[in-house]
Amino acid sequence: MEAREVEEMRRSRLLTLGGIGYTAVIALAALVLVMGALGLVLKVAAAAGALPSEVAKVANALPGLKASVDANPAAGSLSSVSVST
């Protein structure tokens, strides 16, 4: 092989790896945004008076997600909402 062909192959591999890395970063950023939005929705639902067990049940029905809500419905307070994959 000529040096030029080797250089073209090397450049092609780097572009492919860069594209894969770029796609992975975008996918991770999208996942973070979705998780944040889901957490916000759960907080609003819990603050609106939904029972914590109902909110967690709906969130846990989504594939790949686990949610927990710590709240005191009698006092109308919301301690925390957490969502994880």
Swiss-Prot record:
Residue stretches spanning the membrane: 22-42
Leader peptide range in chain numbering: 1-18
This protein's record includes keyword Disulfide bond: no
Superkingdom field: Archaea
Cellular compartment(s): Cell outer membrane
CC terms in the record's Gene Ontology section: membrane
Primary location group: membrane
Bilayer disposition of the protein: Single-pass membrane protein
Keywords: Cell outer membrane, Membrane, Signal, Transmembrane, Transmembrane helix
Note: Ignicoccus hospitalis is unique in having an energized outer membrane while ATP synthesis occurs within the periplasmic space.
Subunit composition and interactions: Forms extremely stable complexes with apparent masses of 150, 50, 45 and 38 kDa. Found in a ring-shaped complex of 7 nm diameter with a 2 nm channel through the middle. Complete denaturation requires temperatures over 110 degrees Celsius.
Role, per record: The most abundant protein of the outer membrane, it forms a pore through it.
Name this protein carries in UniProt: Major outer membrane protein 1
